[in-house]
Each structure stands twice: as C-alpha cells, then as structure tokens.
C-alpha cells in the first residue's frame, strides 16, 4: 500500500495496480507512475522555474500532487468502456521466476574494475 494507499481508500480503485511516487528534494516536482495489466501512465506536476515549489513534503510529495490526478484520470478511463481498458488482474507467470540477489558478488567485481571509486573501510 505505502504512499499510494489513497488509490484504494479515497479513489475506490480496487483492482490490481502497481505504482511509484517520486519527489524532488525541494518539492518542486512530484510524479506518480501507475501500472495496470493493460495500461501504463504517468503524471508529473512541477514548473520549469525551479524556485516554484511547495513548502513541505506533506504538500509537495508525488503522492499528494500527482497521484490524485492519476487516480481521477483512471476513474474516467475505467468509466469510458469505449477505451477498452479493463480492471483485470495481472497475469501470473506460467513458470516460477528466479532472480539472483547477491550484491556482494557484484560489489567485488566493481571494486576490481573501478579501484579508484571504492575506498576500503567506507
């Protein structure tokens, strides 16, 4: 659920949705990327002038300024049946997926190739 919980509770979008919020450090840009089984869309809110920003993360975070636009957009997309965007679940992979997660292996390889970047003891 995380920062996108309002998609379910406030906007009543109960189908399977993956999403990611983002915010710049000075709250001048916020975005939300939403992924459904048959549509991927993103919303960015910001200004070209970097001095334009919200005073706090509570107001200027992607979950507060971009997610509401995305959720309202998706409500309208789902309401317009002529678009053919359904509220289906994600398709389960036919076979189990495996992903190697051995960060130490890659860190050692990077240290060999980039000795000047890594300093021992840090």
Residue ranges and their predicted role:
Residues 111-122:
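Short, low-complexity, Pro/Ser/Thr/Gly-rich segments in the mature regions of secreted, periplasmic
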Residues 1-106, 119:
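A penicillin-recognizing enzyme superfamily signal
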């Amino acid at each position: 659920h995380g920062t996108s919980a309002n998609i379910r509770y406030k906007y009543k979008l109960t189908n399977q949705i993956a999403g990611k919020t983002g915010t710049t450090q000075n709250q001048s840009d916020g975005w939300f990327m939403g992924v459904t089984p048959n549509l991927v869309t993103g919303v960015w809110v910001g200004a070209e002038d970097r001095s334009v920003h919200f005073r706090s993360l509570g107001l200027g975070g992607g979950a507060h300024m971009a997610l509401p636009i995305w959720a309202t957009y998706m409500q309208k997309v789902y309401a317009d049946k002529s678009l053919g965007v359904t509220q289906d679940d994600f398709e389960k992979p036919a076979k189990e997926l495996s992903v190697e997660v051995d960060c130490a292996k890659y860190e050692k390889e990077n240290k060999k190739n980039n000795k000047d970047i890594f300093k021992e003891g840090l």
